[in-house]
Amino acid sequence: MKISLVVPVFNEEEAIPVFYKTVREFQELKPYEVEIVFINDGSKDATESIINALAVSDPLVVPLSFTRNFGKEPALFAGLDHASGDAVIPIDVDLQDPIEVIPHLIEKWQAGADMVLAKRSDRSTDGRLKRKTAEWFYKLHNKISTPKIEENVGDFRLMSREVVENIKLLPERNLFMKGILSWVGGQTDVVEYVRAERVAGISKFNGWKLWNLALEGITSFSTFPLRVWTYIGLFVASISFLYGAWMIIDTLVFGNPVRGYPSLLVSILFLGGVQLIGIGVLGEYIGRIYIEVKNRPKYIIKKSHRGNP
């Protein structure tokens, strides 16, 4: 039985040797043929040469190198495209997702699950801000989007070959893999685990990238941000109508003069701000449509070696 590990890497020269050694020395994976698909996402350090060297000595290492940095989501998709295992497991190279969890994922899969989620029961290794923003994102996403995504589940999971083939059929260029992996469906099971500290290096995923990923997740699986502006428009129009009616009554019945420029200026600025926000939301969706219709590839591979080059 063949198990494929899909491992996106970006400037991870310190972590790759530790990860490889840990996988190959882990006794509970010895009964399986374990393929490791490294996807080098445009690294500037020695990452590419390290994974190519591993492939020379180990035919079960598949090194893929992008021509530039395309991002983690395209890297994951490339890994799924090139993984050949009966089951495929995306996993981070930093070993925060422990190798020891993999046998439990395999056990659930062999019991009949199409997808086995690895759920973090403890995120104390993440900073407080990251934990809170992740909690807010999951709650917001699951309120307004379909399908819902399991809270505290990242990319670390096991997928059957059938699920992987279904994912590969999806044509979109704007990728939010957590949503895509949930969208394909199938019988799902969960394994809980405690997230560990990084074995080497530092995280390359900063706050700005997390913000963009959150936007991608919401705009890829929900039209609520567009629909909400209909309700905002109705609300503003209703308030404006009531305020206008009150001004007429106040003038005709009570004889008070019409208020001057301050109220007019505030109204114009308020409506202008509302319109700009609405245009911004609309622009986010139009921009994604623009990217999709150009039909560019999700990624471009510079080098691919299986075994000896």
From Swiss-Prot:
Any one GO molecular-function label of the UniProt entry: glycosyltransferase activity
Record key words, sorted: Cell membrane, Glycosyltransferase, Membrane, Transferase, Transmembrane, Transmembrane helix
UniProt keyword Nucleus, yes or no: no
InterPro entries per UniProt: Glyco_trans_2-like (IPR001173), Glycosyltransferase_2 (IPR050256), Nucleotide-diphossugar_trans (IPR029044)
CDD domains tied to this protein: DPM1_like_bac
Enzyme class: transferase
Disulfide bond sites: none
EC number: 2.4.1.-
Ranges that cross the membrane: 229-249, 263-283
GO CC term (a single one): plasma membrane
Entry membrane topology: Multi-pass membrane protein
Localization per record: Cell membrane
Protein family membership: Belongs to the glycosyltransferase 2 family. GtrB subfamily.
Role: Involved in O antigen modification. Catalyzes the transfer of the glucose residue from UDP-glucose to a lipid carrier.
PANTHER family for the chain: PROPHAGE BACTOPRENOL GLUCOSYL TRANSFERASE HOMOLOG, UNDECAPRENYL-PHOSPHATE 4-DEOXY-4-FORMAMIDO-L-ARABINOSE TRANSFERASE-RELATED
Protein name per its UniProtKB record: SfII prophage-derived bactoprenol glucosyl transferase
Source organism per UniProt: Shigella flexneri
Species lineage: Bacteria, Pseudomonadati, Pseudomonadota, Gammaproteobacteria, Enterobacterales
